[in-house]
Swiss-Prot record:
Main location: cytoplasm
The protein, known as: Centrosomal protein Cep290
Matching InterPro entries: Cep290
Encoding gene, per UniProt annotation: Cep290
Coiled coil regions, renumbered to chain: 76-384, 471-505, 853-887, 922-970, 1192-1233, 1405-1439, 1501-1654, 1726-1935
PANTHER family linked: CENTROSOMAL PROTEIN OF 290 KDA
tRNA processing listed as a keyword: no
Organism: Drosophila melanogaster
Length: 1978
């Protein structure tokens, strides 16, 4: 069928097939491998096509499967996990199967051995049948068999014991495991406890930290208070001084007034005296009445004066007293000041406040404790009352009486007893289990079994059952044997009876002797012994020997008979159980005949006859003795009568013994017979004569005694009779007793008999069941045999052969494995993957058949079902166990409850018995409390259990997670391995050409690869040729076009310029192009080599993949992305073939199909690259290349980039070639023209001159245009700036208005404060903090502008200047012939940059507007706060009215409060403002943070929020609890009151004793203590939670602050980076411009020098013009001004745009000079121009094309020197700038600026001196040197300036270090709290410093004017520079001043705000008990 596949199935048919048919075809193709040689050659191709199609179909299937796998990964994982589980199950089942197989083998061997034994037994049986003539030998064999069985039984017993020991060990192990688990649980619990302890410790630590922080805050607050008090004290001192001054002035005034009065009094006295004398002299005649009136007047005046004097004296006294009091007050104040200064002694006010606080807190605590105690007492009393009432009611209803309680107690005791029994039983079970575990451990140790190994007990149990069955069988056999023995005994007794019947004809004596009552089977030997005392006398030695022999024979017969019976029974059993044992009927018949013959044996009859003979002999002897003593018959008869009683007494116990013997059967029949027989057999022959003589002597003694008796008295006889009578009574009693005992024993015997019968019946039943079991086992054995036979039939080989084969197979497999390992080591299995089949680790193969696989599947299903059943059973068992545990727990709980009830009842009984009702109540309460406590403890234990459970579950979860991870990892690894194996299998199918089969002709692959290589080479050659062809054609076309253009439009000068430009560009581009081309070629070559190597190494589909796998999509992409290039591709036909092969051959999906996302990524990457390439211009290709190299990580990306760049370069190269062609033609044309112009023709000369003039005019026009454009743009920017300035001004005005409003508000606040102060005498001083605050708030907006923006504005101005200077460089270099186009483009860029700066200014304006809005908002908030403060003020005033005694301190406190609150408000406003600014910045600059940081911060914030929420909820819950508690307390109080009333109403039952009261009090105290402890714990928990909350809040606040700081730092860093990048860009631009300008200027200057030298040779007028030139030229590259332009090439902030002037008429337009000289020396000028052009051409050709020559070298060196100098100067400037900024910042931080200013002045002086020295040197050099010396001087001067600047930088650095060190040492509070006097001093110093600076500046100006007069025009630039530097210095000083002012303000603000914050925090915490962080964070 396989031969006809190609005929029956074609490709078309195959495609129409269904999936099943395709699968069948695939399988048939796989089967083809066997019959591969039979295939005909013609159908090979078709089969190959078919196989390829099948493989393609399979590949598609694989791809679909992979897609589905990729789609449903989650389900796949689950399935894989299940698969893993099933694999493990399979592995286990296989292991078990192997074990079962091995067991089956062992059983088979055992069965064979048993069969052999059975055969041997059968043979022996046959032999025994044959040799049946000898029954003894048969018996021997039977005995041997029995011995074997016994040995087997012993072996079984030993095994059973071992199994038991193993089980015990197992149990012990399980117990130890349980113990270990418990230990583990305890350890876990301990761990949990430890972790809790750790958390507690951490919480305590945190609380301590918080306390420390609080203390620190308190310290800071106290320090603030101290400073405030100091300030107040100083104020009071000032006031006191003022007061004293006033009073002193007043006192002085009073003294002066007093003196005046005294003088007036004296004068008046003198006047009076004078008047009195004059009146006495002149008017003696006047009447007495007038004198009296005058005297009265004078007296009145004097009295009035005296009164006035007294008043004044009183006033003076009062003043003196006031002075004294004031001095005392002053002294007190001084003392207080000293005390305040003393740091150890605390202040009085603080002490008072602290003491009061302490007292208040102590009082509060006492009150709270009293309250709590009272409440607790109330609760307790209410509870007691309730319980008492309930108890009383119960008592009344007889529910709680004594009798029911006792009944309950008894019932409970019974229950307790029952529980105790149960517990004991459980304990016994547990002990037994422990013993089992110990036994198991011992057994494990003995057998060396490790603890981990689990031993299955099923087999052991089954074996044990079998052994038990065997034992039961054997016991049954024993019982049957015993029954047989019984039967034998019965038969024996029957025979004896028959014998006795036969011997009835014997004498009467015998009959009498035999008539004794006897049991069945008893030998009546006792009677004979009693009746015949002389039976031992008789025969001699011969008879005894015969008797012995006879006895031996009898015993042998008996043993043989019993053995025969046993053997017969065994044979019957064997016959029943086994098929093989067959007993002959003859043998059985013989045995049966032999056995009953034993009943009538002659031995027994002979024994009986002998006995009878012995008896007869004894009777004869007795008769003879009677005849001998005939005379003494009467005496003898009396003796006999006397002796009969003891004989009778001796007979009874013998009989009873006999009865007992019959009841107790002997174990073996032989022993019984012997025991019965030995005493019965008499030996009359053995009795000697001496015995008879001894008897006679005894009889004589008796006779003598009788005689004595007879001769004795009647009394003696009576006594003797009495004794005998007593003896007889005793004997009768004994007999009665013995009878009773006998009856009892008889009853017992009957019971035992019935029991034995029942047991026999049971044994019969058991026997029947065993027989059934035996039948069942037989059937099983038959089945096993059949199976064994089947196995034997299957296994054709014997066991030995099988073993040999297995051994050989193992050796071969080992060899094969080694060979495979070696082979795979050579083949590199990592590359090829793995072999086909089930691949092991050693790369061996196992093939499995379909049948085996199906069997395995079925087994798997069965095992799964079994597993499901087992799981179900285990679940059920677990459920049962759970239920049992719950029951146990419930029982334990019940027990506990019962015991508790029992105790309660006892208490109740005791309470009832006690007389007092209070005792009863207390007992009840105590019981309830105990029950509650028990309940609490139970709940606690349950909680702990739950915690443990949770921990266990957590650990289990973690373990499961770990295991899951591990399994996932294992699964991944296995999956990768399986994938590798799968791939290797697929590969190996196609690698069979070398190993197994030759149905796939893959030989053409190598040829194909070789052909492909050839094809590639041909393609490359063709491409190279095409390139060459295209190139030449293009050049031809370009040359033609250029010639046409040159012929028509262009002039020679323009051509020359273009030529030079294009040549330089093309050079550069060529070099770059060559480098990139080389790179690209190398990469392409490497790629090709790689592909070829891969193709040759791997299989055919891999080859195709390697060669063409990535070809199509990538080429398409390239065509789409790069429209200019064509992808290198083979022919269409070739590609089609490749596609067909790829589609048909590769069974694995191509990597392009597998990974579509990779393609998209590459597409996007390529697109990005292309986009960047299109955006970049031609001059930036190198930088772009570098970027590409940096960004590309893989070789593929590099290759793509290099290709793209190469294509670009090729384009640029083509353009350059075109340009070269054009320029070459232009050059040729210009040369020809120059040659033509060389001929002396006037017209041509005029034309050339005109062309030059036109060229210059055009250039001037273009320059003018650019200048106009620049001017317009500048005007526009100026307008925009002016607008912005106006806007800024308006904004500032608004800000000022707002500040004014704030000031008014502050004034209002001040007014309110003044109202507060009630003393009108003390002058109200305004608080400096408010002033500073108002000033700071007024300048806040300006400060913000100046702080943040001044530096940026200054930098922007300095950055704006250089581009303008750079723009003017090419403008000045305009009039020359050769002008580049690049600077113009640069100018445009700079203009656009200037325009770009406008939006930044707009942004600034927006920011200002935002700030304005914010300030308005803040004003509103301020107003609201003012209102609040007013309200608070009112409240404070009311309080002050109420509290009159403490007015002053309260006023001070209010003032402090107001200040603090203002500060706090300000601080909050600032923090809010900062927060808003940070938010806005963060929103603007989100890119500053990385995503990870943001995510972390967000997570932290979320966490903190969550924790805060949790804490809030906890707090709320606690509050609710508190509310509930309060409600309950209220209810309890009400209840207690009601109960008290009830108790009062109730009659008193009993009198309270002191003892009871004491006990009660003690109990109550204990309870109170306990409840207090509980309350303290609850409070502690609350406090802990609060502290935790506060800690969390502080942490979150700290985190927020850190975050804000980080944001600020990042923003600053970003700003600085941006500035740095801008400066670098500006530097690069200026460098490029300068390089271009230098090159052009250097060339022009050299040409100029040559021309001037030529002109100098020709005539004097040219010299004058040259001198003129030298005078007027002011370009930076001019050789006349080389010493001036030291630092011109790199623009600096010190240079302004005004230093450069526009192009002067003298210097910029050479046409002017030419027109002056044209008339005089026209021909000379033409010659000079010609020579100049020639020189230029030569130089250009020499420099640009060859790149060699001394001129080029010199120019290059000059360029390098200039660049070096420029860079060094710039670096120094930047360093100086950086140091300056650092110094400024340090200065601002330090706070004191006097030393800094002095040092700054000193540095400025040094700098001016250095500049003077430089100027002097320049002058001297200018006077001395010229020509080459000039250049050297220039270099030296540059070096000197650099050195001086470096020295300056060193000084600045040292100063910076000093400042940094100084700042660390001087930072303290004293520096922060600088007084106004110090500020004034600093201002004075600053003014002096400014004066010094101005003086120095004036001196400098004078010197510079002198220098300018001396130096002339050359010093102008230096003067301008100096002026600029001065301006800069002035600006800097101004900036410094502003910064200082701002810093001082900021420091003051900060201080005030800190104080405010501290106070506000304190107040808030005191008033509201709310943490301050909450307010800030919210």
């Amino acid at each position: 069928m396989s031969m006809d596949i190609p005929e029956t199935v074609s490709l078309r048919k195959f495609r129409d097939f269904s999936a099943r048919q395709k699968q069948e075809l695939y399988e048939t193709l796989l089967e083809l491998a066997e019959s591969i040689d039979e295939l005909p050659k013609k159908s090979l191709r078709k089969t190959l096509e078919l196989t390829l199609a099948v493989l393609e179909y399979k590949g598609e299937q694989v791809q679909q499967l992979q897609e589905s796998a990729a789609g449903g990964l989650s389900s796949d994982r689950r399935l894989q996990d299940e698969n893993e589980k099933l694999k493990r199950m399979l592995q286990k089942l296989e292991d078990e199967r192997d074990g079962l197989k091995s067991k089956a083998k062992e059983l088979g061997e055992e069965i064979r051995q048993l069969e052999l034994r059975l055969q041997e037994a059968a043979q022996q049986a046959e032999i025994s049948d044959k040799d049946s003539s000898d029954p003894l030998s048969e018996l021997d064999k039977q005995e041997q068999l029995l011995q074997n069985i016994d040995s087997k039984n012993k072996h079984i017993k030993r095994l059973l014991k071992e199994i038991e020991t193993l089980q015990n060990q197992n149990i012990a192990q399980s117990k130890t495991i349980v113990l270990h688990e418990r230990e583990l649980q305890t350890i876990k619990a301990n761990l949990v406890q430890l972790s809790q302890d750790i958390t507690k410790v951490e919480q305590e630590r945190k609380s301590l930290k918080q306390k420390e922080q609080q203390q620190a805050l308190e310290i800071t607050r106290l320090e603030g208070n101290l400073t405030f008090l100091e300030v107040e004290r100083e104020k009071q001192e000032v006031e006191m001084r003022q007061f004293l001054d006033k009073y002193e002035a007043k006192s002085l005034g009073w003294r002066q007034a007093l003196d005046d009065r005294d003088k007036e009094v004296e004068r008046l006295k003198k006047q009076l005296e004078g008047k009195s004398i004059s009146s006495g002299q002149t008017n003696s005649s006047n009447s007495q009445s007038q004198q009296e009136e005058e005297h009265a007047k004078l007296r009145q005046l004097l009295e009035s004066r005296e009164q006035r004097i007294e008043k004044l004296e009183e006033k003076i006294k009062s003043m003196a007293e006031e002075m004294v009091s004031s001095t005392r007050a002053m002294n007190q104040l001084c003392q207080e000041k000293e005390r305040a200064h003393d740091p150890e002694q605390p202040r009085a006010c603080c002490q008072m406040i602290e003491e009061r606080l302490r007292e208040a807190t102590a009082r509060c605590q006492q009150l709270s404790e009293m309250l709590e105690a009272a409440e607790q007492d109330n609760v307790l009393k209410s509870q007691q009352a309730l319980h008492a009432i309930s108890a009383l009611e119960a008592y009344k209803r007889d529910e709680d009486g004594l009798i029911p309680a006792l009944r309950r107690c008894s019932g409970l005791e019974q229950k307790v007893a029952a529980r105790d029994k149960q517990l004991r039983a459980y304990i016994q079970e547990l002990n037994s289990l422990h013993e089992v575990v110990q036994e198991n451990e011992l057994l494990r140790r003995k057998l060396h079994i490790p603890d981990d190994v689990v031993i299955m007990a099923k087999n052991v149990h089954s074996k044990q059952r079998n052994k038990d069955k065997q034992i039961e069988r054997l016991t049954l056999k024993l019982r049957t044997s015993e029954e047989l023995r019984l039967q034998l005994k019965l038969e024996k007794s029957e025979l004896r009876r028959k014998l006795l019947e036969l011997q009835q004809d014997s004498p009467q004596t015998l009959n009498e002797s035999l008539q004794a009552p006897s049991e069945v089977g008893e030998v009546p030997h006792s009677v004979h012994l009693e009746n015949s005392p002389r039976r031992g006398q008789g025969d001699g030695a011969a008879s005894s020997e015969m008797q012995n022999r006879y006895d031996e024979v009898l015993a042998e017969n008996e043993t043989l008979r019993s053995g025969m019976y046993e053997i017969l029974e065994k044979l019957r059993e064997y016959d029943a159980t086994s098929e093989h044992i067959t007993i002959d009927s003859d043998l059985l018949r013989r045995l049966i005949e032999a056995l009953p013959g034993g009943t009538t044996t002659p031995q027994r009859l002979q024994g009986q006859l002998l006995e009878l003979k012995a008896r007869e002999e004894a009777l004869r002897q007795l008769l003879e003795q009677q005849n001998y003593s005939d005379s003494e018959t009467g005496e003898l008869s009396s003796v006999h009568s006397l002796c009969e009683v003891p004989e009778i007494a001796e007979e009874h116990p013998v009989e009873e013994d006999a009865v007992l013997n019959t009841a107790t059967r002997p174990s073996s029949p032989t022993e019984a017979t012997m025991g019965l027989r030995r005493p019965t057999v008499p030996d009359p022959e053995e009795k000697p004569t001496n015995e008879a003589l001894a008897e006679l002597s005894i009889l004589r003694k008796h006779y003598d005694e009788l005689r004595l008796h007879m001769s004795a008295d009647g009394s003696d006889l009576m006594n003797r009779n009495q004794e005998l009578h007593d003896q007889m009574i005793a004997l009768e009693l004994q007999l009665e007793q013995q009878r009773n005992s006998y009856s009892y024993m008889r009853r017992d015997y009957d019971q035992l008999l019935t029991e034995t019968r029942k047991q026999e019946l049971r044994f019969i039943d058991d026997k029947a069941s065993l027989a059934r079991q035996l039948e069942h086992s037989k059937s099983e054995l038959c089945e096993a045999r059949e199976e064994l036979e089947q196995v034997n039939r299957r296994n054709l080989y014997t066991a030995e052969e099988q073993q040999k084969l297995e051994h050989r197979n193992a050796i071969l497999s080992m060899q094969l494995g080694q060979a495979m390992e070696q082979l795979l080591g050579e083949l590199k299995p990592t590359e090829i993957c793995a072999e086909y089949g089930i691949i092991r680790e050693n790369y061996q193969l196992d093939y499995i058949t379909a049948q085996d696989f199906e069997e395995q599947q079925q087994e798997l299903l069965t095992w799964r079902s079994k597993q499901a059943e087992l799981q179900r059973e285990t679940k059920q068992l677990e459920g049962l166990l759970h239920v049992a545990n719950e029951q146990i727990h419930s029982q334990q709980r019940l027990l506990n409850e019962i015991t508790d009830n029992h105790i309660n009842l006892r208490h109740l009984v005791a309470d009832l018995q006690s007389s007092s009702d209070e005792k009863l109540m207390l007992a009840k309460v105590q019981r309830d409390l105990d029950s509650v406590k028990a309940e609490c403890s139970r709940l606690e234990t349950e909680r702990e259990k739950l915690q443990l459970k949770a921990d266990c579950l957590q650990t289990q979860l973690e373990a499961s997670e770990l295991s899951l991870k591990q399994t996932q990892q294992d699964f991944q690894q296995e999956r990768t391995n399986s994938d590798i194996k799968h791939k290797f299998l697929q590969h190996s199918l196609f690698m069979l050409k070398d190993k197994y089969a030759k149905f796939t002709p893959l030989v053409f692959l190598t040829n194909f690869v070789f052909a492909y290589q050839k094809f590639q080479r041909r393609l490359e050659e063709e491409q190279v040729q095409q390139r060459h062809r295209d190139h030449t054609a293009l050049i031809d076309e370009v040359t033609a076009v250029v010639q046409a253009k040159i012929g028509l439009n262009e002039e020679s000068s323009q051509q020359l310029v273009k030529l030079i430009k294009s040549e330089t560009q093309t050079r550069l581009l060529e070099q770059r192009c060559e480098i990139l081309q080389a790179k690209q070629e190398e990469l392409v070559r490497e790629l090709g080599e790689l592909r070829m190597s891969q193709a040759t190494d791997t299989e055919h589909w891999s080859t195709i993949q390697a060669l063409f796998g990535e070809g199509e999509p990538r080429s398409q992409l390239k065509v789409d992305a790069e429209t200019n290039t064509d992808a290198v591709a083979p022919n269409l036909a070739m590609r089609r073939a490749v596609q067909l092969i790829d589609r048909e051959s590769s069974p694995i999906g191509s990597p392009l199909r597998k990974h579509p996302h990779l393609d998209t990524a590459t597409q996007t990457l390529e697109a990005q690259v292309e986009f960047s390439e299109t955006a970049v211009q031609t001059n930036g290709i190198l930088s772009q290349q570098n970027q590409a190299v940096q960004t590309a990580d893989a070789v593929e990306d590099n290759r793509r980039d290099s290709r793209a760049e190469l294509q670009k370069m090729q384009e640029t190269l083509q353009e350059a070639n075109q340009r070269i062609e054009i320029l070459g033609k232009q050059l040729e044309a210009s040369r020809s023209e120059s040659r033509e112009s060389a001929s002396p023709q006037g017209g041509v000369v005029e034309k050339t001159i005109l062309s030059f003039h036109t060229l210059l005019l055009e250039k001037d026009q273009s320059i003018q245009k650019y200048q106009d454009l620049l001017q317009t743009e500048r005007d526009q920017s100026q307008q925009a700036l002016s607008k912005q300035v106006a806007e800024n001004e308006s904004l500032r005005a608004t800000v000022n208005n707002l500040n004014f409003n704030i000031k008014t508000k502050d004034a209002e606040i001040q007014g309110l404060k003044e109202k507060l102060r009630q003393k009108p005498e003390v002058p109200v001083e305004r608080n400096p903090s408010t002033d500073s605050r108002s000033s700071s708030s007024s300048d806040s907006s300006v400060n913000e502008l100046t702080d943040e923006k001044i530096e940026e504005l200054f930098e922007s101005s300095s950055v704006e200047r250089p581009p303008q200077e750079e723009l003017e460089v090419p403008v000045e270099a305009g009039p020359e012939n050769i002008v580049t186009e690049e600077p113009e483009g640069e100018e445009e860029k700079q203009d656009t940059e200037e325009l770009k700066e406008v939006p930044t200014l707009h942004k600034q304006i927006k920011d200002l507007k935002d700030k304005l809005e914010y300030s308005e908002r803040s004003l509103k908030t301020r107003e609201e706060e003012v209102d609040i403060l007013k309200e608070k003020l009112k409240l404070c005033q009311e309080r002050e009215k109420s509290v009159e005694s403490t007015v002053n301190p309260e006023l001070d406190q209010l003032r402090i409060f107001l200040d603090e609150k203002d500060k706090h408000i300000k601080d909050l406003m600032d923090t809010l403002k900062n927060f808003h600014d940070d938010q806005q910045r963060y929103i603007k600059d989100t890119s500053n943070f990385s995503e990870d940081q943001i995510a972390k911060l967000a997570a932290d914030l979320n966490r903190t929020e969550a924790t805060n929420k949790i804490y809030h909820t906890q707090m709320e819950a606690l509050r609710r609890q508190l509310a509930n508690v309060t409600q309950r307390e209220k209810q309890a109080r009400d209840l207690s009151q009601s109960l008290r009333q009830q108790l009062l109403k109730r009659p008193v039952v009993s009198i309270k004793t002191e003892l009871n009261a004491r006990v009660k009090n003690e109990n109550q105290l204990k309870r109170i203590q306990q409840l207090e402890l509980d309350l303290d714990e609850a409070r502690g928990q609350l406090q802990r939670q609060q502290t935790l909350l506060e800690a969390k809040r502080t942490r979150s606040a700290n985190e927020v602050q850190l975050w804000e700081k980080q944001k600020r730092y990042q923003q600053q860093a970003e700003k600085t980076k941006a500035r740095l990048e801008e400066t670098e860009l500006a530097l690069e631009k200026t460098r490029a411009l300068l390089q271009a300008a230098r090159t052009t200027i250097a060339r022009l200057e050299k040409d100029k020098q040559i021309l001037e030298s030529k002109l100098g040779r020709n005539g004097p007028p040219s010299n004058s013009s040259g001198g003129n030139n030298l005078k007027c030229c002011r370009t930076p590259s001019c050789p006349n001004l080389q010493h001036v332009g030291v630092s011109k090439f790199a623009p600096s902030p010190s240079e302004s745009p005004e230093t450069y002037t526009g192009p002067s008429s003298e210097c910029s337009s050479p046409a002017h000079h030419h027109t002056q000289i044209f008339d005089q020396s026209q021909l000379d000028l033409i010659e000079a121009l010609k020579s100049r052009i020639e020189l230029q051409q030569r130089k250009i050709i020499a420099m640009e094309l060859e790149g060699r020559g001394s001129n080029a070298l010199t120019t290059e060196l000059e360029k390098l020197q200039e660049r070096c100098q420029a860079i060094e100067a710039q670096n120094i400037r930047l360093e100086a700038r950086n140091l300056q900024l650092q110094l400024d910042s340090d200065l601002l931080r330090q706070g004191d600026s006097s030393d800094r200013l002095q040092k700054r002045i000193k540095h400025l002086e040094d700098y001016i001196m250095a500049l003077k020295e430089e100027m002097a040197r320049n002058e001297s050099r200018r006077e001395l040197g010229s020509g080459l010396k000039v250049s050297t001087n220039q270099g030296q001067s540059a070096e000197q300036t650099i050195l001086s600047l470096r020295n300056l930088v060193e000084k600045l650095r040292s100063e910076n270090k000093f400042l940094k060190d100084g700042r660390r040492s001087t930072e303290s509070r004293s520096s922060m709290d600088s007084t106004p006097a110090e500020a004034a001093r600093l201002q004075q110093q600053h003014a002096e410093a400014l004066e010094k600076i101005s003086a120095l500046q004036q001196e400098l100006q004078k010197r510079t004017t002198k220098c300018s007069q001396c130096g002339g025009r050359s010093k102008d630039a230096a003067n301008e520079e100096l002026k600029f530097i001065k301006e800069q210095l002035v600006k800097k000083t101004q900036l410094l001043q502003k910064a200082k002012v701002l810093l001082t303000r900021a420091a003051a603000k900060e201080k005030v705000l800190r104080e405010q914050l501290a106070l506000w925090k304190r107040k808030c915490s005191e008033l509201q008990n709310v943490p301050v962080i909450d307010e800030i964070s919210e």
